[in-house]
Amino acid sequence: MASGLGDLSVGVSSLPMRELAWRRVADDSHDLWCCCMDWKAHVEYAHPASELRPGSGGWPEHAEAQWRQQVHAAHDVWCNCGDWQGHALRSRSRTAESGRSSSSSSVSVLSDGDQQPWWRRLRVKRPKFPSWARRWTQRHDSEERASQQAKNDSTS
């Protein structure tokens, strides 16, 4: 999931849609390591900060700690509110209703106490590609520019 964090903010345009995409990723990734079918239960229990990092615990505790870190990091990619647990515990139907009502206006999907409009809470970043992907993209772009330059030179 860590390698696709940038994709979440680039592929989906509105905050409610980003939140739904984030929930889908959290749900699907939870099912890879736990069979309880309730990923919100893992969010409700407030672990001390020392437990958020994988420690000397067994495999389930290690997987849960990693999953919580990744869901938290994925939230921070698309939202600036700092309340990933609040977003996780909000019902999906409330998010979907908010998405329908705010898609064309500045009505926001806000947690209690946060009065910023949705468009101020968006975090729009360039995706962080691995080094091999950056090199490939740079090479591809330079080859494309060279072929475009050759076309321009031949036509003039």
Swiss-Prot record:
Domain of life: Viruses
Compositional bias per record (Polar residues), positions renumbered to this chain: 147-156
Low complexity bias locations: 96-111
Annotated stretches, region: Disordered: 90-114, 133-156
The protein's name: Protein US1
Source organism: Human cytomegalovirus (strain Merlin) (HHV-5)
Upper lineage: Viruses, Duplodnaviria, Heunggongvirae, Peploviricota, Herviviricetes
